[in-house]
């Protein structure tokens, strides 16, 4: 079964996205940030007000719905030469099922259709210590974030 992507535009969906973001961010980042700092990050970056401000600045948020259940969300912004995938979060039980890959492929198709040459995103390097390009020889990650860029052919 393929998920549906529901555009977040109305206030009730903005609030639902903010609630989901809080749940997922607390689950994903609890290992890396103290609770109070994480609460502040969520409030500043993924609260209903922050999401509404993003939407006002041309960021497109989508809820990921599978079988009538909201299982995640993603957000992207079209830039001059690229589509910037800003957020992609799925509930734990839906990870590893190629749903994220399908979202990225959808973004690639959209970018191509808009005449953009690439899709890019950043992710927390601390979550992916097995990525060799992000590691130094001593096994430490030199930066908190790694940029992934895919040039469209």
PLM features per residue range, with description:
Residues 94, 98:
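Glycine-rich phosphate-binding loop
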Residues 4-93, 103-110, 114, 143, ...:
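Acetyl-CoA-dependent GNAT
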Residues 138-139:
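Short Gly/Pro-enriched turn/cap motifs at secondary-structure boundaries
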Residues 121-131:
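Conserved beta-strand-loop-alpha-helix junction that forms the acyl-donor binding cleft
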Residues 1:
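Short, conserved catalytic or adaptor-binding loops enriched in Gly and charged residues
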Residues 72, 132-135:
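A structural microfeature
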Residues 117:
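Short acidic/polar active-site loop segments enriched in Thr and Asp
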């Amino acid at each position: 079964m393929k998920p549906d992507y529901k555009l977040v535009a109305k206030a009730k969906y903005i609030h639902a996205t903010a609630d989901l973001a809080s749940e997922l961010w607390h689950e994903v980042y609890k290992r890396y940030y103290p609770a109070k700092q994480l609460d502040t990050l969520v409030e500043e970056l993924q609260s209903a007000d922050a999401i509404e401000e993003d939407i006002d600045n041309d960021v497109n948020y989508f809820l990921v719905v599978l079988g009538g259940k909201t299982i995640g969300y993603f957000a992207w912004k079209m830039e001059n030469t690229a589509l910037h995938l800003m957020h992609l979060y799925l509930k734990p039980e839906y990870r590893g099922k190629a749903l994220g890959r399908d979202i990225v492929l959808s973004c690639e198709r959209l970018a191509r259709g808009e005449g953009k040459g690439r899709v890019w995103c950043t992710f927390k390097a601390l979550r992916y210590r097995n990525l060799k390009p992000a590691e130094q020889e001593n096994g430490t990650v030199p930066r908190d974030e790694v940029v992934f860029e895919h040039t469209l052919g």
